[in-house]
Amino acid sequence: MNLIPTVIESTNRGERAYDIYSRLLKDRIIMLGSAIDDNVANSIVSQLLFLQAQDAEKDIYLYINSPGGSVTAGMAIYDTMQHIKPDVQTICIGMAASMGSFLLAAGAKGKRFALPNAEVMIHQPLGGAQGQATEIEIAARHILKTREKLNRILAERTGQPIEKIEKDTDRDNFLTADEAKAYGLIDEVMHPAE
């Protein structure tokens, strides 16, 4: 069962109940806390566009705890993040894997973070094909083009040479928050205020 907490907010017009995600959205916080599919992407994209319409100058905060998911759905989020005017700060909590790590790296330069115990995992895109040999060949060419595109963007976002990205994403590659910073996937590890 998936319960969504409700918060009560008192205003001069009385009390108002919000689901927690709507309340966070008021503070320009978007939660990506699941696998990425078309429905999740549509929700994230809608929230990004809404927050831009509200104020195109203020940063948006995208918290990521995701195992990844659909490449096309993730690219819809990525393209929107790059298209809108506000900077999108990305913060990894828990795990940002696969497309989740790609979106983490897609945040505004200097504004990509991870909590100290967060993990980041990068790898090449997954896919499968069935059907006639020609259909399998078409699918294979497509996934190779997709891998090339993702690797090129990751190289741009991290500052790593494309050859290193290709090697490092050949298999699941798990990084600690500090390793993700050294790699260029994030800019800072967030530590508690002292």
Swiss-Prot record:
The keyword Transcription regulation does not apply. It is an enzyme of class 3 (hydrolase). Gene3D superfamilies: 2-enoyl-CoA Hydratase, Chain A, domain 1 (3.90.226.10). It catalyses: Hydrolysis of proteins to small peptides in the presence of ATP and magnesium. alpha-casein is the usual test substrate. In the absence of ATP, only oligopeptides shorter than five residues are hydrolyzed (such as succinyl-Leu-Tyr-|-NHMec, and Leu-Tyr-Leu-|-Tyr-Trp, in which cleavage of the -Tyr-|-Leu- and -Tyr-|-Trp bonds also occurs). Its EC number is 3.4.21.92. It comes from the Bacteria. The active site is at 98 (nucleophile), 123. It is found in: Cytoplasm. Keywords: Cytoplasm, Hydrolase, Protease, Serine protease. GO terms for biological process: protein quality control for misfolded or incompletely synthesized proteins. InterPro entries: ClpP (IPR001907), ClpP/crotonase-like_dom_sf (IPR029045), ClpP/TepA (IPR023562), ClpP_His_AS (IPR033135), ClpP_Ser_AS (IPR018215). Its main location: cytoplasm. GO terms for cellular component: cytoplasm; endopeptidase Clp complex. Cleaves peptides in various proteins in a process that requires ATP hydrolysis. Has a chymotrypsin-like activity. Plays a major role in the degradation of misfolded proteins. Belongs to the peptidase S14 family. Fourteen ClpP subunits assemble into 2 heptameric rings which stack back to back to give a disk-like structure with a central cavity, resembling the structure of eukaryotic proteasomes. This is ATP-dependent Clp protease proteolytic subunit. It comes from Macrococcus caseolyticus (strain JCSC5402).
